[in-house]
């Protein structure tokens, strides 16, 4: 029992800074929306449309680079710290190549935006302008993620938290300058949010790089030599590990986007109620997602040390803590669902629907916690390919079709509207949780030599 208590303390010590970093990141998006809305409703809508395209593109790169965390954690645990700098250099090369692809996609996103049904031309122009300003921040964002993953792989999660709040503090005044045109800068409205956010990502990267350069704990792995050439073997391995994570993230983001589009013809009340419940459940998701990042670090580190039993302890402890958190947040959601909905909107119909959907959200929080922490465990074992297949099957083969049938057809029951899609979420997330646990159990039952051989690759 004592080893589980000790492991839980270490997991929470790693997870809490990640939670706070995610809060800072979410707050940046909130600030952009509010400040753009203060300028005009059109600018706020342009930022919202631009963000809906930016997120899938940049999260694909983000997911690809998540491969660095278990690699570095395993090298750290095995005492091969001298190899970490080379892995990080290749991470920067990979981020550079992905940045170019993301920038090309975002530069040409105008074709997607202008093809939207009945979109106002002025709104489309502002959304395109926002993306074309923001895309210059893509390299800064991805370079920052490489540096952050280096720190987190070494069990240093506080720097990411500090840089997140630094970015938030810088974002507010820089937004003000470029939205309203102060200190000699042009008045750009919502496009100014894109300029500000791009600048903030570069500030965060430079600050993180400065920390790494001066941190005593990283003195032995600091790269003082030339940057070096791309290493095709290392980059291939990072892509093999990272691509399934990137695709899983992409399919998860696009799933919720598709559901939002399917709900949109059902009327303003349904759209608003769905959005409130989804926004709140996304905030609650920060907790298990951050714990999953901590579990990846601990499992990778323990496997690096050559202890499959300690890796199992880390995995089981992470799941136990995650389920306890989910039970607490589910009770909180059920108890205060009407009060929470009133914070977003005071329309009685919207509040009533949002409160009903939050009941379903409370049900799936436990499944969601298990599946996302399960994904973190599998990342720690470097078994990322299964994450993609499980996510795709659970979300797109089981969750979305069942949600569509329940919400918009009479095949099983009378049309349920948005609640049908939320039943689909429950089916998809529960399926993912079960499949993740089965895969984890299969991996942990293999001989230690095979587990450690996979982890050392």
Swiss-Prot record:
GO terms for molecular function: antiporter activity; xenobiotic transmembrane transporter activity. Keywords: Antiport, Cell inner membrane, Cell membrane, Ion transport, Membrane, Sodium, Sodium transport, Transmembrane, Transmembrane helix, Transport. Coiled coil: none annotated. It comes from the Bacteria. It is found in: Cell inner membrane. The keyword Cell inner membrane applies. Belongs to the multi antimicrobial extrusion (MATE) (TC 2.A.66.1) family. MdtK subfamily. Its main location: membrane. It is a multi-pass membrane protein. This is Multidrug resistance protein MdtK. The chain crosses the membrane at residues 11-31, 53-73, 93-113, 127-147, 160-180, 188-208, 243-263, 276-296, 314-334, 357-377, 387-407, 418-438. GO terms for biological process: sodium ion transport; xenobiotic transmembrane transport. It comes from Salmonella arizonae (strain ATCC BAA-731 / CDC346-86 / RSK2980). Multidrug efflux pump that functions probably as a Na(+)/drug antiporter. One of its GO terms (cellular component) is plasma membrane. InterPro entries: MATE_fam, MATE_MdtK, MdtK-like, Multidrug-R_MdtK.
């Amino acid at each position: 029992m004592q080893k589980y208590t000790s492991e839980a303390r270490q997991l929470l010590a790693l997870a809490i800074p990640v939670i706070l970093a995610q809060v800072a990141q979410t707050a940046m998006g909130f600030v952009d929306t509010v400040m753009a809305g203060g300028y005009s409703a059109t600018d706020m809508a342009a930022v919202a449309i631009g963000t809906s395209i930016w997120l899938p593109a940049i999260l694909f790169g983000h997911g690809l680079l998540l491969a660095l965390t278990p690699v570095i954690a395993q090298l750290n645990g095995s005492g091969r710290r001298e190899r970490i700098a080379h892995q990080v250099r290749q991470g920067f090369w990979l981020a550079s190549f992905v940045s170019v692809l993301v920038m090309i996609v975002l530069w040409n996103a105008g074709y997607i935006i202008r093809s939207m049904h009945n979109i106002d031309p002025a709104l489309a122009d502002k959304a395109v302008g926002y993306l074309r300003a923001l895309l210059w921040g893509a390299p800064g964002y991805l370079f920052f993620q490489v540096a952050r993953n280096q720190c987190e792989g070494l069990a240093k999660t506080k720097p990411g938290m500090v840089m997140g709040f630094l970015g938030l503090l810088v974002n507010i005044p820089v937004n003000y300058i470029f939205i309203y045109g102060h200190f000699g800068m042009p008045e750009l409205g919502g496009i100014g949010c894109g300029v500000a956010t791009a600048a903030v990502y570069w500030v965060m990267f430079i600050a993180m790089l400065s920390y790494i350069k001066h941190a005593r704990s990283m003195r032995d792995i600091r790269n003082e030599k030339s940057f070096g050439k791309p290493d095709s073997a290392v980059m291939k391995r990072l892509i093999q590990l990272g691509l399934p994570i990137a695709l899983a993230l992409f399919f998860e983001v696009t799933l919720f986007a598709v559901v939002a589009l399917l709900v949109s013809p059902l009327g303003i009340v349904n759209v608003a109620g769905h959005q409130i419940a989804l926004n709140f459940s996304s905030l609650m998701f920060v907790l298990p997602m951050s714990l999953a990042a901590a579990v990846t670090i601990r499992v990778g580190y323990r496997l690096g040390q050559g202890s499959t039993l300690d890796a199992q302890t880390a995995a089981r402890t992470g799941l136990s803590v995650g389920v306890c958190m989910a039970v607490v947040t589910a009770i909180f959601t059920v108890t205060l669902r009407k009060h929470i909905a009133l914070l977003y909107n005071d329309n009685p119909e919207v509040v009533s629907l949002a409160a009903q959907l939050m009941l379903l959200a409370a049900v799936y929080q436990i499944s969601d916690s298990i599946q996302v922490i399960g994904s973190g465990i599998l990342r720690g074992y470097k078994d990322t390919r299964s994450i993609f297949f499980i996510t795709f099957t659970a979300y797109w083969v089981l969750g979305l079709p069942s949600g569509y049938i329940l919400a918009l057809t009479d095949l099983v029951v009378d049309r349920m509207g948005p609640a049908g899609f939320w039943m689909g979420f429950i089916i998809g997330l529960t399926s993912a949780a079960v499949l993740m646990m089965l895969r984890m159990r299969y991996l942990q039952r293999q001989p230690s030599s095979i587990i450690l051989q996979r982890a050392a690759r």
